[in-house]
Amino acid sequence: MEEEVPGFYGESGKSVQATLSSLKMLDVGKWPIFSLCSEEELQLIRQACVFGTAGNEVLYTTVNDEIFVLGTNCSGCLGVGDIQSTIEPRRLDSLTGKKIASLSYGSGPHIVLATTDGEVFTWGHNAYSQLGNGTTNHGLVPCHISTNLSNKQVIEVACGSYHSLVLTSDGEVFAWGYNNSGQVGSGSTANQPIPRRVTGCLQNKVVMSIACGQMCSMAVVDTGEVYVWGYNGNGQLGLGSSGNQPTPCRVAALQGIRVQRVACGYAHTLVLTDEGQIYAWGANSYGQLGTGNKSNQSYPTPVVVEKDRIIEIAACHSAHTSAAKSQGGHVYMWGQCRGQSVILPHLTHFCCTDDVFACFATPAVTWRLLSVEPDDHLTVAESLKREFDNPDTADLKFLVDGKYIYAHKVLLKIRCEHFRSSLEDSEDDIVEMSEFSYPVFRAFLEYLYTDNISLPPEEAVGLLDLATFYSETRLKKLCQQTIKQGICEENAIALLSAAVKYDAQDLEEFCFRFCINHLTVVTQTSGFAEMDHDLLKNFISKASRVGAFKN
């Protein structure tokens, strides 16, 4: 069983990030506290965060950039200037007009919020200086934190139980608050009343993301390494021991593995690699590591999730629950799920990881800042999306591989320069297409209606070819983003070749870096053996310049 510090179990801190993906699948109604809001109010919500020892506090923003709060207001965590509870939404006037980029909260609870302008505001519980304002007085209203941050652009925040971290745009981490286990990373165990840069092993590193456990801190740097510090009683630092770390220490067991993201549960840790693999370590009394048993692990241990590539991991400091989403859209959960111990990843019927925490975590809270959109009416974009491939309203159909795709001439001419000229004087209502496959051309037309692409990474190369052929710059960028999600050692050279062929410079650099980071395996693949001579020559030359062949 993991060690629990009295008073720490309740609302432990967790990092929450705004997300623009899967907006239609998010439903704030799954959190009971939103039953206090009217339907009209729910339709205006743009972002939402549910927290508190019983999921009894909420902060949300509206389409008008107003911030509202409701709940028990423990320690003044609603920021409205008093400690009165409220079952009706109250507007947080001091932050009206501010757009939230990142938000996190702690056990008191205390709130740390970063705006899209890079400013930091804090309020709520402050017995351990976790607000960073130099005092230990609770903050009843949002306070702008500028000490040592005045010239910094903060892009991400994270809270432990009673300590806080922020990440700046230049890759620096600042920390403050409770430090009994070294979680502030200052090298001592004295509390830190104001923001202090975390240095040591991070001094010359560029940090890409941060996370906090109950009393520990973590950072992922641009090289894919993970640095950890603070409390380690359950092995949650992944160092093979249970001793606390007062300064950042690299997780050596992940040598050669590039981590993209880290997430912290109550006393366990998850990381996601660039190949879509999950590793877990720390407390495991509820099966939250997903290893098939309940034994704690002090070293990173692989989590097997079918044969699906994972693109998202989720954990929440107030629960012993873990979740993940695959490239194919499957959502898995494990750990403590409504009182049951699920010791292996379990495939759910959910569309997003947020639903796992709404329906199975205790308490029912959000693990990140949700983004939602009103659905009281169809927007222009939604209306256009509905009309794609609709034979009832179309005035044009494409014949591709023996199958029809229905479209509308006026929209195609508005959205695509190629169609603007090719359809200008055409009276044909059927166009045969042989240059591209049915899935690729259908995905292209769907993109013109929705501004999104829905192709798996392995087929997106064909769409990249089309985007290059039609000079569709934005589509080309989206294709590159999709292709990146499917890279592995076996196809890295093929994707690099495609990137060079279609002058996709961002993808080319990404594939090259991936090949360098996995050089030993990549050079043994059939793709490398069959590599074009000129491409091979350029690859070796460039690899040499970045020191890939140094002893």
From Swiss-Prot:
InterPro entries: BTB/POZ_dom, RCC1/BLIP-II, Reg_chr_condens, Signaling_Regulatory_Domain, SKP1/BTB/POZ_sf. SMART domains: BTB. The keyword Repeat applies. One of its GO terms (biological process) is spleen development. One of its GO terms (cellular component) is acrosomal vesicle. It comes from the Eukaryota. RCC1 repeats lie at residues 64-115, 117-169, 171-222, 223-274, 276-326, 328-382. It is found in: Cytoplasmic vesicle, Secretory vesicle, Acrosome. Its main location: cytoplasm. Keywords: Cytoplasmic vesicle, Repeat. Residues 394-457 form the BTB domain. The BTB domain might play a role in targeting to acrosomal vesicles. This is RCC1 and BTB domain-containing protein 2. It comes from Rattus norvegicus. The gene is Rcbtb2.
